[in-house]
Protein backbone atom coordinates (compact mmCIF):
# COMPACT_ATOMS: atom_id res chain seq x y z
CA UNK A 1 0.00 0.00 0.00
CA UNK A 2 1.35 3.39 -0.97
CA UNK A 3 1.74 5.84 1.90
CA UNK A 4 0.02 9.23 1.44
CA UNK A 5 2.11 12.36 0.93
CA UNK A 6 2.76 14.67 3.80
CA UNK A 7 4.57 14.29 7.05
CA UNK A 8 7.13 11.45 7.12
CA UNK A 9 6.25 8.33 9.07
CA UNK A 10 7.20 8.52 12.71
CA UNK A 11 10.61 6.94 13.03
CA UNK A 12 10.91 4.18 15.58
CA UNK A 13 13.60 6.04 17.50
CA UNK A 14 11.57 9.26 17.79
CA UNK A 15 14.71 11.32 17.29
CA UNK A 16 14.44 14.90 18.56
CA UNK A 17 15.53 17.97 16.62
CA UNK A 18 18.33 18.59 19.13
CA UNK A 19 19.57 15.01 18.76
CA UNK A 20 19.54 15.41 14.96
CA UNK A 21 21.64 18.58 15.22
CA UNK A 22 24.08 17.09 17.71
CA UNK A 23 24.56 14.01 15.54
CA UNK A 24 24.85 16.15 12.40
CA UNK A 25 27.66 18.20 13.95
CA UNK A 26 29.38 15.03 15.12
CA UNK A 27 29.06 13.39 11.69
CA UNK A 28 30.38 16.53 9.99
CA UNK A 29 33.38 16.53 12.32
CA UNK A 30 34.01 12.87 11.49
CA UNK A 31 33.55 12.80 7.70
CA UNK A 32 34.22 16.44 6.79
CA UNK A 33 32.28 18.75 4.51
CA UNK A 34 32.75 16.51 1.47
CA UNK A 35 31.37 13.39 3.16
CA UNK A 36 28.46 15.06 4.92
CA UNK A 37 25.18 13.97 3.31
CA UNK A 38 21.56 13.74 4.41
CA UNK A 39 21.64 10.01 3.64
CA UNK A 40 24.72 9.45 5.82
CA UNK A 41 23.08 11.36 8.67
CA UNK A 42 19.83 9.43 8.23
CA UNK A 43 21.71 6.12 8.33
CA UNK A 44 23.54 7.20 11.47
CA UNK A 45 20.28 8.09 13.22
CA UNK A 46 18.24 5.24 11.76
CA UNK A 47 15.65 7.56 10.23
CA UNK A 48 14.23 8.29 6.79
CA UNK A 49 16.20 11.08 5.03
CA UNK A 50 12.90 12.91 4.49
CA UNK A 51 12.78 13.47 8.26
CA UNK A 52 15.34 16.24 7.87
CA UNK A 53 13.32 17.96 5.16
CA UNK A 54 10.31 17.94 7.48
CA UNK A 55 12.28 19.48 10.36
CA UNK A 56 14.62 21.81 8.49
CA UNK A 57 13.09 22.42 5.04
CA UNK A 58 16.20 21.52 3.04
CA UNK A 59 19.95 20.98 3.32
CA UNK A 60 20.57 24.70 3.77
CA UNK A 61 18.05 24.78 6.61
CA UNK A 62 19.83 21.88 8.32
CA UNK A 63 23.24 23.54 7.94
CA UNK A 64 21.86 26.83 9.25
CA UNK A 65 20.29 25.08 12.26
CA UNK A 66 23.58 23.27 12.93
CA UNK A 67 25.41 26.61 12.96
CA UNK A 68 22.76 28.20 15.15
CA UNK A 69 23.28 25.40 17.67
CA UNK A 70 27.07 25.64 17.46
CA UNK A 71 27.17 29.44 17.84
CA UNK A 72 24.27 30.04 20.25
CA UNK A 73 26.54 30.08 23.31
CA UNK A 74 28.48 33.11 22.05
CA UNK A 75 27.38 36.23 23.87
CA UNK A 76 28.47 39.80 24.42
CA UNK A 77 30.48 40.07 27.64
CA UNK A 78 28.63 42.62 29.74
CA UNK A 79 31.69 44.15 31.37
CA UNK A 80 34.51 46.17 29.89
CA UNK A 81 35.03 48.71 27.17
CA UNK A 82 33.52 48.10 23.74
CA UNK A 83 36.97 47.00 22.47
CA UNK A 84 37.37 44.46 25.28
CA UNK A 85 33.85 43.17 24.64
CA UNK A 86 34.47 42.90 20.87
CA UNK A 87 37.63 40.90 21.54
CA UNK A 88 35.66 38.63 23.89
CA UNK A 89 32.98 37.96 21.28
CA UNK A 90 35.57 37.28 18.58
CA UNK A 91 37.64 34.95 20.78
CA UNK A 92 34.49 32.95 21.60
CA UNK A 93 33.54 32.85 17.90
CA UNK A 94 37.07 31.73 16.98
CA UNK A 95 36.85 28.89 19.50
CA UNK A 96 33.50 27.71 18.07
CA UNK A 97 34.80 27.87 14.48
CA UNK A 98 37.86 25.91 15.57
CA UNK A 99 35.54 23.31 17.12
CA UNK A 100 33.54 22.99 13.86
CA UNK A 101 35.73 24.16 10.94
CA UNK A 102 33.88 22.04 8.37
CA UNK A 103 30.64 23.75 9.37
CA UNK A 104 32.16 27.10 8.45
CA UNK A 105 33.31 25.67 5.12
CA UNK A 106 29.77 24.35 4.42
CA UNK A 107 28.31 27.78 5.16
CA UNK A 108 30.81 29.43 2.80
CA UNK A 109 29.79 27.01 0.03
CA UNK A 110 26.06 27.50 0.62
CA UNK A 111 25.31 31.20 1.23
CA UNK A 112 21.59 30.45 1.70
CA UNK A 113 22.60 28.54 4.83
CA UNK A 114 23.95 31.68 6.54
CA UNK A 115 22.75 31.21 10.14
CA UNK A 116 20.77 33.59 12.34
CA UNK A 117 23.36 33.25 15.09
CA UNK A 118 26.14 34.45 12.78
CA UNK A 119 24.01 37.49 11.89
CA UNK A 120 23.40 38.13 15.59
CA UNK A 121 27.13 37.94 16.33
CA UNK A 122 27.99 40.39 13.54
CA UNK A 123 25.24 42.75 14.73
CA UNK A 124 26.65 42.65 18.28
CA UNK A 125 30.11 43.48 16.96
CA UNK A 126 28.75 46.29 14.77
CA UNK A 127 26.88 47.82 17.71
CA UNK A 128 29.96 47.63 19.92
CA UNK A 129 32.03 49.34 17.22
CA UNK A 130 29.49 52.17 17.12
CA UNK A 131 29.63 52.36 20.93
CA UNK A 132 33.42 52.64 20.56
CA UNK A 133 32.90 55.78 18.45
CA UNK A 134 32.78 54.54 14.86
CA UNK A 135 30.24 55.66 12.33
CA UNK A 136 27.81 52.94 11.22
CA UNK A 137 29.47 52.88 7.77
CA UNK A 138 32.97 52.41 9.20
CA UNK A 139 31.58 49.87 11.66
CA UNK A 140 30.27 47.71 8.79
CA UNK A 141 33.70 47.80 7.16
CA UNK A 142 35.43 46.74 10.38
CA UNK A 143 32.91 43.99 11.09
CA UNK A 144 33.92 42.44 7.77
CA UNK A 145 37.61 42.82 8.54
CA UNK A 146 37.36 41.34 12.03
CA UNK A 147 35.01 38.47 11.18
CA UNK A 148 36.89 37.52 8.00
CA UNK A 149 40.17 37.58 9.92
CA UNK A 150 38.61 35.31 12.56
CA UNK A 151 37.28 32.87 9.94
CA UNK A 152 40.62 32.70 8.15
CA UNK A 153 42.66 32.28 11.32
CA UNK A 154 40.44 29.51 12.72
CA UNK A 155 40.23 27.59 9.46
CA UNK A 156 44.00 27.85 8.90
CA UNK A 157 44.72 26.52 12.39
CA UNK A 158 42.11 23.74 12.01
CA UNK A 159 43.61 22.70 8.66
CA UNK A 160 47.09 22.67 10.20
CA UNK A 161 45.80 20.49 13.04
CA UNK A 162 44.37 18.05 10.50
CA UNK A 163 47.44 17.92 8.27
CA UNK A 164 49.79 14.96 8.43
CA UNK A 165 52.74 17.31 8.76
CA UNK A 166 51.37 19.15 11.78
CA UNK A 167 49.09 16.87 13.78
CA UNK A 168 49.33 19.12 16.83
CA UNK A 169 48.32 22.28 14.98
CA UNK A 170 50.30 25.49 14.76
CA UNK A 171 51.28 25.88 18.41
CA UNK A 172 53.15 29.07 17.58
CA UNK A 173 50.00 30.91 16.46
CA UNK A 174 48.34 33.09 19.09
CA UNK A 175 44.93 34.29 17.85
CA UNK A 176 44.40 36.54 20.87
CA UNK A 177 47.71 38.32 20.23
CA UNK A 178 47.02 38.65 16.50
CA UNK A 179 43.53 39.97 17.26
CA UNK A 180 44.97 42.52 19.70
CA UNK A 181 47.32 43.77 16.98
CA UNK A 182 44.44 44.06 14.53
CA UNK A 183 42.25 45.79 17.12
CA UNK A 184 45.00 48.39 17.59
CA UNK A 185 44.21 49.47 14.03
CA UNK A 186 40.64 50.30 14.94
CA UNK A 187 41.42 53.79 16.15
CA UNK A 188 38.23 53.82 18.18
Go through each PLM region and give its residues:
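Amphipathic alpha-helical segments used for helix-helix packing
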Residues: 67, 94-124, 155-163
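Hydrophobic alpha-helical connector segments
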Residues: 75-115, 136, 143-146
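A contiguous pocket-lining binding segment that forms or flanks enzyme active sites
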Residues: 122-143
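Short hydrophobic clusters on alpha-helical segments that form packing/core surfaces
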Residues: 20-28, 66, 70, 93, ...
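Helix-turn-helix
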Residues: 19, 23-61, 65
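N-terminal intrinsically disordered/low-complexity leader segments
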Residues: 1-15
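C-terminal peripheral helix-coil segments that are non-catalytic and often amphipathic
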Residues: 1-4, 131, 159, 163-188
Amino acid sequence: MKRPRGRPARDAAGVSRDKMLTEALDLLGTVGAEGFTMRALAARLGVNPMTFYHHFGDRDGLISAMADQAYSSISDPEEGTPRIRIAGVLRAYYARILSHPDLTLLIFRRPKAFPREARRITEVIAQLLVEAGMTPQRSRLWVGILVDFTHGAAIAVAMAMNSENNAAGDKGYDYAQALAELMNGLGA
